[in-house]
Curated annotation (Swiss-Prot):
Its main location: plastid. This is Small ribosomal subunit protein uS2c. Keywords: Chloroplast, Plastid, Ribonucleoprotein, Ribosomal protein. One of its GO terms (biological process) is translation. The keyword Ribosomal protein applies. The keyword Plastid applies. NCBIfam families: rpsB_bact. The gene is rps2. HAMAP family: Ribosomal_uS2_B (MF_00291_B). PROSITE patterns: RIBOSOMAL_S2_1, RIBOSOMAL_S2_2. CDD domains: RPS2. GO terms for molecular function: structural constituent of ribosome. InterPro entries: Ribosomal_uS2, Ribosomal_uS2_bac/mit/plastid, Ribosomal_uS2_CS, Ribosomal_uS2_flav_dom_sf. Pfam families: Ribosomal_S2.
Length: 231
């Protein structure tokens, strides 16, 4: 049984691709037709591939695997944080710092710094510092929160990464390929499916399309982890 209906996908605008002249020919198998110079994605395949992806994700979550959600563009940022938090996953929704995965030990030291500053803030220690020093600490805390808040509880590399907008998140995808971290990705018509482990062809620009797909993925993570707890 499909995890999503064609009418839900249509309503969310998941079928709208990019202008035909901007396409990646490798996406041809997932394109239904061209209309007014815009490629239309085959939603039958979207529903099938999303269902298969969610079954895989549920099984992985049941085994205790951890997921990192990534989407730094405006349309995705809110959904990414919301669904990652809901499913007890990690997320990056502001800026991908180069080496976030491939140079994890350095990034981890910044995460530990964030944790220390937050503890100092909660204990009121920052307020007790001289005015200038307190201001420096608060600026540092704000910057670290902005970039690292979604991974501050991540003690090791994630088992899987869920990506919105392959073209934008190239650096992260290259890091995952280098480290062998499987990539689950919403693929628009300008993307390359050959470098993605679990492709989900769909509109990666429309908020409703992003939310529909990412929330189904989060549901599957929750189902898997809940089943494991109640075993």
């Amino acid at each position: 049984m499909s995890i999503v209906s064609l009418s839900e996908l249509l309503e969310a605008g998941a079928h709208f691709g990019h202008q035909a002249r901007r396409w990646n020919p490798r996406m041809f198998p997932y394109i239904y037709t061209e209309r007014n110079g815009i490629h239309i994605i085959d939603l039958v395949q979207t529903a099938q591939l999303l269902t298969e992806a969610c079954q895989f994700i549920r099984d992985a979550s049941q085994e205790g695997k951890k997921f990192l959600f990534l989407g730094t563009k405006r349309q995705a940022a809110g959904v990414i944080a919301e669904q990652a938090i809901r499913s007890n996953s990690y997320y990056v929704n502001q800026r991908w710092l180069g080496g976030m995965l491939t140079n994890w030990m350095t990034i981890k030291s910044r995460v530990e710094r964030l944790q220390r500053l937050e503890m100092d803030e909660q204990a009121g220690l920052i307020d007790m510092l001289p005015k200038k020093e307190a201001a420096i600490n608060r600026r540092e805390l704000d910057k670290l929160r902005k970039n690292l808040n979604g991974i501050k509880n991540m003690s090791r590399l994630p088992d899987f990464i869920v990506v919105v907008d392959q073209k934008r998140e190239t650096t992260a995808i290259q890091e995952c390929i280098k480290l062998g971290i499987p990539i689950i990705c919403i693929l628009d018509t300008n993307c390359n499916p050959e470098i993605i482990d679990i492709p989900i062809p769909a509109n990666d620009d429309a908020i409703r399309s992003i939310k529909l797909i990412i929330s189904r993925i989060a549901d599957s993570i929750i189902e898997g982890s809940t089943y494991a707890l109640n075993k």
